[in-house]
Amino acid sequence: MKVVIQRVSQAQVAIEEQIVGQIKQGFMVLVGIHQEDTPEDVAYVVGKISKLRVFEDDEGKMNRSIQEIEGSILSISQFTLYAKTKKGNRPSFIEAARPDVAIPLYELFNQQLEAEGIAVATGEFGADMQVSLTNDGPVTIVIDTREK
């Protein structure tokens, strides 16, 4: 599982020009599911995201988690995180999980974040989405369970 986490002051996702998810302060998370991912990978990433201390405390240091600031997450499925570009110019997505594997794990990911007390907004799995956000920092962090 690979996620790209961006600290944002706001973010939203639209499908066919209709806003389907939006948040204020928190994270916009791009979520890629690998063909070999398991619920254990989901739990690992959720644990990292929920405790990641990248929000400023009273002294201006990155020392607070999304839970501590009562922030939200905009979760966007993103199979292209598993693009391979070694050969040729057209990316291969062979390592990305097929929808029958990816959808349940993506839903589990969002459910586990909510179980941690974090409000989660989402796009729609497999849809053509327009995502907009205001980076805060910017702070961008990548977590890949293949590298833990």
UniProtKB/Swiss-Prot annotation:
The gene is dtd. Its main location: cytoplasm. The lineage of its organism: Bacteria, Bacillati, Bacillota, Bacilli, Lactobacillales. It comes from Enterococcus faecalis (strain ATCC 700802 / V583). It is found in: Cytoplasm. Coiled coil: none annotated. An aminoacyl-tRNA editing enzyme that deacylates mischarged D-aminoacyl-tRNAs. Also deacylates mischarged glycyl-tRNA(Ala), protecting cells against glycine mischarging by AlaRS. Acts via tRNA-based rather than protein-based catalysis; rejects L-amino acids rather than detecting D-amino acids in the active site. By recycling D-aminoacyl-tRNA to D-amino acids and free tRNA molecules, this enzyme counteracts the toxicity associated with the formation of D-aminoacyl-tRNA entities in vivo and helps enforce protein L-homochirality. This is D-aminoacyl-tRNA deacylase. Gene3D superfamilies: D-tyrosyl-tRNA(Tyr) deacylase. It comes from the Bacteria.
